[in-house]
């Protein structure tokens, strides 16, 4: 056991060094490249998810980013959604449109029609997509289905009572690969589980704590954790031994991918590692 823990500790040290020293460079130089394919990383089974679509080559949380993820052959595309003032679920990460769009204002205070008057004007490859508009949850699902790519839907806004409207949208479709819901908010996770006992849900956290594992067990969810927190690597087996599915975000370096796969973490979200 001590030898195993020592090996894990060495892995953690590698992770910490990589995340602290190399992250700055790679997050600036974000273009996906064939040298970041997984062939050299590991032979273990795992599933790659494109973070906010393939956001290294197209604007995050946009239709082109999902299209590029589908063309690249990702297992799943992760994207963020929140409801507008009039209840339309749109694909965007921030509470406001300010960072990624031509307008200003909070999503919850803007109608869908008002947001459609704006364009997405920020992100990788934006010069290739003039007049790019925001997409709805329905439109995002259409693209995922087109490529037989699983939809990983992160709820970024809305209240517990809004979760039914998401399930209503999903319930109108027959999926080749069932979508899954991910969320940092305990109340929304609990509400979603109460409404649907079968849909796959992952509770997102920075740190895997005792109460994280208990909450996941009580609500029959997986756990999505931050790869850059060293202590998480010592909790992986605790969670797995209790039947909890684990996923890690956001992994952009092959040595880290190799460590996670060695620890049997099968679901990996990335900005730039190609399938």
Task: List the predicted regions and their residue ranges.
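Phosphate-group recognition and catalysis centered on beta-loop-alpha active-site segments
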Residues: 2-275
């Amino acid at each position: 056991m001590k030898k195993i823990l020592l090996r894990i500790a060495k892995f953690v040290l590698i992770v910490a060094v990589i995340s602290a020293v190399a992250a700055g460079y790679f997050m600036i130089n974000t273009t996906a490249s064939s040298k970041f394919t997984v062939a050299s990383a590991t032979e273990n089974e795992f599933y790659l998810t494109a973070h906010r679509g393939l956001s290294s080559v197209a604007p995050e949380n946009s239709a082109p980013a999902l299209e590029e993820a589908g063309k690249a052959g990702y297992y799943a595309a992760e994207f963020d959604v929140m409801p507008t003032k009039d209840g339309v679920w749109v694909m965007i990460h921030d509470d406001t449109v300010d960072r990624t769009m031509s307008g200003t204002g909070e999503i919850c205070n803007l109608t869908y029609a008002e947001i459609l008057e704006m364009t997405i004007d920020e992100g990788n490859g934006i010069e290739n997509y003039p007049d790019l508009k925001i997409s709805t949850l329905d439109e995002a699902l259409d693209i995922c289905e087109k490529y037989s790519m699983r939809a990983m839907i992160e709820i970024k806004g809305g209240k517990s009572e809004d979760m039914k409207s998401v399930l209503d949208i999903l319930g109108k479709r027959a999926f080749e690969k069932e979508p899954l819901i991910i969320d940092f908010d305990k109340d929304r996770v609990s509400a979603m589980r109460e409404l649907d006992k079968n849909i796959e849900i992952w509770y997102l956290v920075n740190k895997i704590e005792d109460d994280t594992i208990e909450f996941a067990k009580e609500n029959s969810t997986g756990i999505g954790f931050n790869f850059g927190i060293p202590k998480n690597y010592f909790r992986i087996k605790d969670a797995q031994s209790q039947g909890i599915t684990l996923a890690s975000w956001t992994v952009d370096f092959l040595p880290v991918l190799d460590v996670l796969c060695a620890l049997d973490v099968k679901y990996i979200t990335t900005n730039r590692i190609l399938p």
